[in-house]
Amino acid sequence: MTRPKKPALPKAKKVRGVVPSAEAQKLLINAAIEMLHILPFDQVTARAITKKVGLSLPTISNNFGSMAGLFNEVTIKLRNNVLARHHKILDQSISLDPDFILRTRLVAWLTLEGENPGQFNNQLIENIAPQFQTALGGLSLRTTTAWLTLIIFMVEGHALFSEVHEYPATQITDGITLLTQLRQQLQNSENALGWNN
């Protein structure tokens, strides 16, 4: 029985001399993201990351305190990448973005590994609620927050379990179409619930 081949990574670079902290952090974060996209998370180790970029092993603890600190910075970088690509507040394709999916899975994994979930709370709802309210014609903060909470739970669930369920692409498209239609009814729902005060 032959073993499956591991994904090929670029060859490790020779060990660099001393580099400025900001440069080291950038190298480590970018290398971690590249590796997390193609390897099982438990194979993305401090040794593997530092070897890939040619830095010494203590560079991670010197710059981030620990691997958890590095991974926390990775989640922030992934979030910023996603928001930069999907700056239109009503763009629902964010849920299919590879960095969004990676961030969601990484946060879930780190939480299961015992990390404090609160450190990964990026106040996404608080940050986008005002823009979302304006885009939809002035919904109340209560309605906006309730809607965004449901949407975030759905897209995070999709990021974690889409491969388990193996839904056809048409089913996902239909779901997004239905959500778009429901979103257009939020003002009526808000009025019916009395949340427009």
Which residues are covered by each model-predicted region?
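N-terminal intrinsically disordered/low-complexity leader segments
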Residues: 1-23, 194-197
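Helix-turn-helix
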Residues: 21-27, 31-69, 73
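Amphipathic alpha-helical interaction segments
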Residues: 27, 102-106, 146-153
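Short alpha-helical functional segments enriched in proximate histidine and acidic residues
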Residues: 35, 81, 131-135
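Alpha-helical DNA-contacting segments of helix-turn-helix folds
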Residues: 64, 70-78, 82-85, 118-121
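Hydrophobic alpha-helical connector segments
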Residues: 73, 80-113, 125
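Mature extracytoplasmic domains of secretory-pathway proteins
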Residues: 114-117, 124-133
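Hydrophobic/aromatic-rich alpha-helical bundle segments in the mid-to-C-terminal region
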Residues: 122-125, 134-197
